[in-house]
């Protein structure tokens, strides 16, 4: 598996930890400012595919129509996150490939690079079901709803 992975040119993998952390605990007390948000958008836009665990990052990748691979190797407590209602809906779209081994990961990477269009219909479903509109006016709509209560 590693030998096959080595055939992919060096320098095409990036591990990003955006934002400012206010705690040593993973996933707790952190914030992303505008610069980090733009960097994340740029990183996804210029990526051939996105590999992450159960995360709204899958929705971000679907918005930019990038193949999505979710890691589920450990079978421990993190595995149960894939069973939660909100994420199960994302998996059911067919727009995300969930892999449970190193071999499945390599196969999914190679297949996604060779045929990025394969899960496109599922990514469209993710956008339709999880995002609704991609017109840049969500803040305006939220503000209008809030103003309607005044």
Per-range role (PLM):
Residues 35, 39, 101, 134, ...:
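Soluble or luminal CAZymes and related metallo-dependent hydrolases
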Residues 1-9, 82-87:
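Short, aromatic/basic amphipathic alpha-helical patches
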Residues 56-133:
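Catalytic binding pocket for nucleotide-activated donors in carbohydrate/polymer assembly enzymes
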Residues 135-150:
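C-terminal alpha-helical cap of glycosyltransferases
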Residues 4-59, 124:
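Donor nucleotide-activated moiety binding/catalytic core segment of transferases
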């Amino acid at each position: 598996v590693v030998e096959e992975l080595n055939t992919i040119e060096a320098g095409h993998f990036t591990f990003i930890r955006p934002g400012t952390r206010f705690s040593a605990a993973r996933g707790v007390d952190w914030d992303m400012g505008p610069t980090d948000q733009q960097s994340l958008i740029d990183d996804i836009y210029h990526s051939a595919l996105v590999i992450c665990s159960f995360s709204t990052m899958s929705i971000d990748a679907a918005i930019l129509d990038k193949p999505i691979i979710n890691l589920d190797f450990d079978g421990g407590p993190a595995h149960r996150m894939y069973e939660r209602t909100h994420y199960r809906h994302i998996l059911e779209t067919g727009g995300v490939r969930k892999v449970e081994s190193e071999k499945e990961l390599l196969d999914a990477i190679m297949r996604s690079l060779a045929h990025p269009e394969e899960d496109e219909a599922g990514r469209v479903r993710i956008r339709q079901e999880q995002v609704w509109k991609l017109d840049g006016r969500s803040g305006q709509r939220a503000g209008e709803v809030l103003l309607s209560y005044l």
